Regions:
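A short acidic-Thr-Gly-centered motif at the start of a beta-strand
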Residues: 1-7
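Aspartic protease core domain of the pepsin/retropepsin superfamily
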Residues: 7-9, 14-97
Length: 97
């Protein structure tokens, strides 16, 4: 996937309730983001917890020739730029059997 000349690596994670984007990508691509009224904690696969305070609303996502929109919580993701979670999969009825 590309965003303003950037190639992004995306993980589709069936264990994630929500979708996320790295703060590095938010900054590099100068994405408009908003602050939650109330922050919340996320437990990562490593059992560490991180606070989520900001999100990108209605991000246009292009995968191959498929264009869609996704709300992305901003969270450091390690080796991935974006994580697509169950919120997006359920919205688009893309549940695995």
């Amino acid at each position: 996937m590309y965003d303003k000349g950037q190639t992004l690596s995306i993980l589709i994670d069936l264990g994630a309730s929500f979708s996320y984007i790295s703060p590095i990508i938010v900054e590099l691509c100068k994405l408009v983001h908003e602050k939650f009224d109330k922050s919340w904690m996320v437990q990562l696969a490593t059992c560490t917890k991180r606070k989520v305070t900001n999100y990108v609303k209605d991000y246009e996502l292009l995968m191959n020739d498929f264009i869609t929109h996704v709300d992305l919580n901003i969270l450091p993701l390690g080796s991935y730029d974006m994580l697509i979670g169950m919120d997006w999969l359920e919205k688009h009825r893309l549940m695995p059997n």
